[in-house]
Amino acid sequence: MNKTIVLAGDRNYTRQLETTIKSILYHNRDVKIYILNQDIMPDWFRKPRKIARMLGSEIIDVKLPEQTVFQDWEKQDHISSITYARYFIADYIQEDKVLYLDSDLIVNTSLEKLFSICLEEKSLAAVKDTDGITFNAGVLLINNKKWRQEKLKERLIEQSIVTMKEVEEGRFEHFNGDQTIFNQVLQDDWLELGRAYNLQVGHDIVALYNNWQEHLAFNDKPVVIHFTTYRKPWTTLTANRYRDLWWEFHDLEWSQILQHHMGEFELISPLDKEFSCLTLTNSQDLEGIEELVTALPEVVFHIAAWTDMGDKLKKLAVYNNVRLHPQIVPPVLDKLKKSTNLYLDINHGSADENFLKSLQEQEKTLLAFQSTQHGELGQIVFENGKVSFMIDTIKDFKKNGHLTCFRQLPSLTCLTFTASQYIEQLDYLAGQLPNVVFQIAAWTAMGPKLYDLSNRYPNIQLYPAISRDKLDELKEKMDAYLDINLLTSTSDIVAEMAHLSKPILAFYKSQNGNNGQRLYSSEHPERMLADLQKLITKDMLEKPLDIIQVKGIDETLDYIIEHNSSLVRFGDGEINMLAGHSIPYQDYDEELVSIMRDIIGQESREDLVVCLPDAFTDRFRFTSWAIPFWKDHMDHYMDFYRELCSDSWYGSTFVSRPYIDFEDKSQAKAQFEKLKSIWENRDLLIVEGATSRSGVGNDLFDEANSIKRIICPSHSAFSRVHELEQEIEKYAGGRLILCMLGPTAKVLSYNLCQMGYQVLDVGHIDSEYEWMKMGAKTKVKFSHKHTAEHNFDQDIEFIDDETYNSQIVARILN
């Protein structure tokens, strides 16, 4: 499609004409550009005309008579009288459809869609002016055939004569030159275009001050960008939208337009190419700015302000690497915020706190001096006068893409003593808190993992092979202790820290000893981060949530004995299943999980005690292999426990497991005696898996009066739960029921308790009793029956036992 475009200008406006033409030709081929003028030298046309021809386009010099009717007509100060030349378009341009463009605009994309718009017998199509009523005459898609037929030139001149007289006599307010005349003559004869075809940015600052939200809310790509009003990119620094783009087209070489159409060149914003820093200021005083600017010539410094700027700031424009943005508007500031690499919080006086918070949310690196820091927003803070330190930091960031050296004044110092190179979430914390120093100390040399972290994060400081004196010095100077080292315990050092009355923060999985630590899940390190930020701002830390209360083994047994209670035990396996997982002896089952969720939510009472693992308050009375298990378990599931469990107390799940996982095993014998006293001289009904054979080969149930057994599937017994309940009811009369059947035991115990039976869920009791009797220090596999959590019942050689066989009253097997 051949596209006919008309521009108008004079010899004082050739720079602007040239910029507009460059933008047209950059985005379009096959255009015919008429330039209405009276005094532009023919020499000026040669270069753009040559380039246009290579793109299948033309540039035509249209000279208007020197003495023209509009020479002395009224106009606004920033507008040339040549603007009235568009009255004469129909006289000089023969094409039927013409696009008129002012020369204070740039084209931002192809004009194909604009030229394809049907004018529907209207004289022109245009975009509304900022008043929302009239049209702006800077972009006019003209029905030139109709202009000729209806002698529009004559009508415009006649109306101009009448209106000019009213203006001269002071009877016409808000006169806007030929735009006013066009609207008077064509007030009902124009088609409205979308804003994209004439995005008027000259009123941006006015829109901001007057809260014209819609004016600044345009987010689509504009086709034409119009620099209306006197706030032009070449006359003012006012930071309206797309000001920088006008200068990019202004500086564009004609040859680069050809290269663009050959696929060899793209106009890329300097913001996307240069390394830059941003400062938004409310004052003229920027700490160390000239030293920064002169020392870092390859770094661009963007200085923005909501208001106009004073001479002190404007003088900085003499530096090639300074960009001033006075009277900036939010869209321009947002663009700078996204594009710049660093923010320099170096302005004295007040600051836009919401803007600074938005930078923090975007994880932008902020640098500040002590005297200019605004709030506690994770700034890297340098001592006053240490501009050279900030210079080195900017160089470091520019070279590496992140900070590798640490010259700032720390806002908080945290110490960790370690006996391994594994420090939980250290990289996350160091990255999120660049102004916090993380000191890592050890008695020995350190591994490569820690050195790698210290190279990546300049705020990690390593102290390998530390002396006692140096460690004591670090202890005294630290603000908080982070008990976050893994593997080898450092509980003795943490105990020392507890005497200093300084905060000790730990993850459940990294906790070393019970030393008053504030505990967090390592799966939510942002919670520890939030508390460290409170320590930076010296805010009070919130009181930790109350610990879930679980009675000890003896206290639980005493309660059961006193009240003849039933017992439902939830261990780690049941919690895994409640969280949506299958476990070795029970496939995941929605119905089972729903029932267990209801049971664990019950309040313990005299007839039913709900039990949880007694590992909420002390995970360090277990063996060396059990401690990390329970630390990891609580790290992963503590939130889940709090969601499920709201009762004021629970019994201990360990009532049937009082031996193998405890470091101190001396109490287990007495606890088993308490257990055995419950069924002494009582008739028992044991409900167990086919491989359990509880009491076979030991005296666990010797004091019972009699025993009956119901044998069930060892795996996924819940699939037969209704049959099991029916069989149990047949034989349960007058008997104490012992259930050893994994998650299914929870359902049976609860349901049978509701029917009035006393039921004890005592899974794993037989293995624990065997281990206690043999004095085992670790789990020993039994060859003739099930071993708790060992080998999943493989390689068992069952021994025929007449007593055991005689006790079986029912078998319900898969």
UniProtKB/Swiss-Prot annotation:
Comment block on domains: Has an N-terminal GT8 domain and a C-terminal GT-D domain. The GT8 has very little glucose transferase activity in the third glycosylation step, but is able to transfer galactose from UDP-galactose to PsrP-GlcNAc-Glc-Gal or PsrP-GlcNAc-Glc-Glc in the fourth step. The C-terminal GT-D domain catalyzes transfer of galactose and glucose to the acceptor protein (PsrP-GlcNAc-Glc) in both the third and fourth glycosylation steps.
Name by which UniProt lists this protein: Glycosyltransferase GlyD
GO MF annotations, alphabetized: glycosyltransferase activity; metal ion binding; nucleotide binding
InterPro entries in the record: Glyco_trans_8, Glycosyltrans_8_dom-fam, GT-D, Nucleotide-diphossugar_trans
Region GT8 domain, annotated ranges: 1-264
Pfam families: Glyco_transf_8, GT-D
CDD domains cross-referenced by the UniProt entry: GT8_A4GalT_like (cd04194)
Record: residues binding Mn(2+): D102, D104, H226
Pathway the protein contributes to: Protein modification; protein glycosylation
Note: Encoded in RD10, a pathogenicity island with an atypical GC content that is associated with invasive pneumococcal disease. Pathogenicity islands account for greater than half the genomic diversity observed between isolates. The main function of this island seems to be correct synthesis and export of pneumococcal serine-rich repeat protein PsrP.
Keywords per UniProt: Glycosyltransferase, Manganese, Metal-binding, Nucleotide-binding, Transferase
Region (GT-D domain): 542-814
Main function: Involved in the polymorphic O-glycosylation of the serine-rich repeat protein PsrP. Catalyzes the third step in glycosylation PsrP in this bacteria. Transfers glucose from UDP-glucose to the terminal glucose moiety of already-glycosylated PsrP (using truncated substrates with PsrP SSR1-GlcNAc-Glc); the C-terminal GT-D domain is sufficient for this reaction in vitro. Also transfers galactose from UDP-galactose to the terminal glucose moiety of already-glycosylated PsrP; the C-terminal GT-D domain is also sufficient for this reaction in vitro. Also catalyzes the fourth step in glycosylation of PsrP in this bacteria. Can transfer the sugar from both UDP-glucose and UDP-galactose to the terminal sugar moiety of PsrP-GlcNAc-Glc-Glc and PsrP-GlcNAc-Glc-Gal; the C-terminal GT-D domain is also sufficient for this reaction in vitro (using truncated substrates with glycosylated PsrP SSR1). The N-terminal GT-D domain can transfer galactose from UDP-galactose to PsrP-GlcNAc-Glc-Gal or PsrP-GlcNAc-Glc-Glc in the fourth step.
Listed Gene3D superfamilies: Spore Coat Polysaccharide Biosynthesis Protein SpsA, Chain A
Native source species: Streptococcus pneumoniae serotype 4 (strain ATCC BAA-334 / TIGR4)
Family named by the database record: In the N-terminal section; belongs to the glycosyltransferase 8 family. In the C-terminal section; belongs to the GT-D family.
Keyword Nucleus: no
Residues bound to UDP: 8-13, 102-103, 226-232
A GO biological process held by the record: protein glycosylation
Gene: glyD
Superkingdom of source: Bacteria
